[in-house]
């Protein structure tokens, strides 16, 4: 069976499950089915949006919001909610937003997963610096996540909320949808190049490049006035811990690349890895580092072929140090990296 048809078949089955469970008021299972369908669409990336999934998510938000009395909800003029569905200390985008909001002296509440309490020291330090309050919620259970996030909205009554999360965060999408017309909601379009869920949950969509707006409007059918280009102020924090690096970066010639590994896959000619292979074959004094996570099936072949010269590292806080000392930064292909390319330009390594 054709892969596209297989994906459509599985996604339709999950939609049917979600629809049935919504009728049965089994919202946890319905949200799980929606999340699974969105994850599949993100992984195979055959389209950028799915109105059926958005409608199902909206229905859940509408049904569950009846548990809250909104008669006394008044916007708090200086309070901002920042929802982070990742909870990753190595991701720069959320720290850029927190830094900007903190510098402008907003009253900010940062909401993230309860499982990351002990693994986000950099974010905690920034929150302490600006007096940003951190709230942890249980994201392991879909309905509980919806309820706890809604409780945060009800408690702090934010004027605006930022939606920064995975492409398949059904619970948060439903919760944000429930506050339509009450709170101004902004989706940070981190995954501007692929499918994501949350169109129903936000008023405005913040992209950092022209491609973001093009796909938002022409592929996701978002009205132009809702598409906002908001550049990022790169955080260039000095990191002194360089432990775990495979060699002395300051005295070695090497090519560096990084980001989510799926951005290097899907090209019939395997161009990205052919370039790496050619460089290492032709230049015996050059090494290669890739920093990032995901499907490493192709990268593993390079590492095995050049065991002392090609290295795969996890996401690192000192990635800018690695960029600064590389001989060449190689962008990912066929999907270009956005933030990494900005940092490579800052380091004059393009």
Go through each PLM region and give its residues.
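Short His-centered aromatic/hydrophobic patch
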Residues: 163-170
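Active-site proximal beta-strand in glycosyltransferases
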Residues: 79, 176-193, 203-210
């Amino acid at each position: 069976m054709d892969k596209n048809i297989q994906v459509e078949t599985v996604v339709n089955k999950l939609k049917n499950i979600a629809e049935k469970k919504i009728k049965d008021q089994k919202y946890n299972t319905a949200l799980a089915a929606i999340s699974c369908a969105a994850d599949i669409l993100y992984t195979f990336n055959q389209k950028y949006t799915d109105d059926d999934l958005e409608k199902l998510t909206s229905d859940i938000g509408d049904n569950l919001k009846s548990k809250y009395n909104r008669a006394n909800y008044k916007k708090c003029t200086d309070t901002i909610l920042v929802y982070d569905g990742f909870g990753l200390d190595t991701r720069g985008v959320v720290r850029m937003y927190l830094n900007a909001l903190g510098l402008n002296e907003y009253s900010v509440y940062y909401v993230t997963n309860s499982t990351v309490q002990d693994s986000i020291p950099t974010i905690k330090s920034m929150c302490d610096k600006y007096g940003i309050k951190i709230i942890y919620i249980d994201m392991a259970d879909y309905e509980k996540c919806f309820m706890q996030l809604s409780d945060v909205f009800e408690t702090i009554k934010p004027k605006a909320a930022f939606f920064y999360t995975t492409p398949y965060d059904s619970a948060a999408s439903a919760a944000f949808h429930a506050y339509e017309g009450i709170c101004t909601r902004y989706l940070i379009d981190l995954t501007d190049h692929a499918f994501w869920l949350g169109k129903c949950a936000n008023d405005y969509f913040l992209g950092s490049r022209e491609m973001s707006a093009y796909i938002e409007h022409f592929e996701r059918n978002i009205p132009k006035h809702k598409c906002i280009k908001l550049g990022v102020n790169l955080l260039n924090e000095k990191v002194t811990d360089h432990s775990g690096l495979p060699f002395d970066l300051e005295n070695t010639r090497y090519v560096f690349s990084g980001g989510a590994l799926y951005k290097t896959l899907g090209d019939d000619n395997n161009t990205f890895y052919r370039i790496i292979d050619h460089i290492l074959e032709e230049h015996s004094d050059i090494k290669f580092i890739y920093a990032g996570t995901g499907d490493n099936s192709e990268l593993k072949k390079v590492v095995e072929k050049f065991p002392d010269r090609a290295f795969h590292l996890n996401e690192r806080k000192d990635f800018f140090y690695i960029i600064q000392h590389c001989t060449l930064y190689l962008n990912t292909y066929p999907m270009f990296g956005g933030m990494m390319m900005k940092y490579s330009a800052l380091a004059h390594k393009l």
